[in-house]
Curated annotation (Swiss-Prot):
Family per record: Belongs to the bacterial ribosomal protein bL19 family.
Disulfide bonds: none
Gene3D superfamilies linked to this entry: 2.30.30.790
Keywords, ordered alphabetically: Ribonucleoprotein, Ribosomal protein
GO BP, one annotated term: translation
Role, per record: This protein is located at the 30S-50S ribosomal subunit interface and may play a role in the structure and function of the aminoacyl-tRNA binding site.
GO cellular component: a single term: cytosolic large ribosomal subunit
GO molecular function: structural constituent of ribosome
SUPFAM superfamilies membership: Translation proteins SH3-like domain
The protein, known as: Large ribosomal subunit protein bL19
PANTHER family linked to this entry: LARGE RIBOSOMAL SUBUNIT PROTEIN BL19M, RIBOSOMAL PROTEIN L19
Length: 115
């Protein structure tokens, strides 16, 4: 990466991000603006992918809401996310868990590991 770009983005990187990987269940506290007020909306689900590096790193969280799969993609270093909590650590052997989109019920479960 260009040293100038790297020096500009260094100050914008967040340091309060917990370490999490695909397969982990996370609770994302996202700031949502409705009209003139702002509130925190909690989105809890399984991390199915993490891509990019540095300031442009993103992760995708998937949950089932009302029987329908919902996915949201967040930048890791955005100020729109208040905090990220890791609820469970999952044991998977893939970096991208897109195959979970085709599974439902017990087949979509991920084995938990203790840390």
């Amino acid at each position: 990466m260009n040293p100038l770009i790297q020096s500009l983005t260094e100050g914008q990187l967040r340091t309060d991000i917990p370490s999490f990987r695909p397969g982990d269940t996370v609770r994302v506290h996202a700031k949502v603006v409705e009209g003139n007020r702002e509130r925190i909306q909690i989105f809890e689900g399984v991390v199915i992918s993490r891509k990019g590096q540095g300031i442009s790193e993103m992760y995708t969280v998937r949950k089932i809401s009302g029987g329908v799969g919902v996915e949201r993609t967040f930048p890791i270093h955005t100020p729109r996310v208040d905090k990220i909590e890791v609820v469970r650590y999952g044991k998977v052997r893939r970096a991208k868990l897109y195959y979970l989109r085709a599974l439902q019920g017990k087949a979509a479960r991920i084995k938990e590991i203790r840390r």
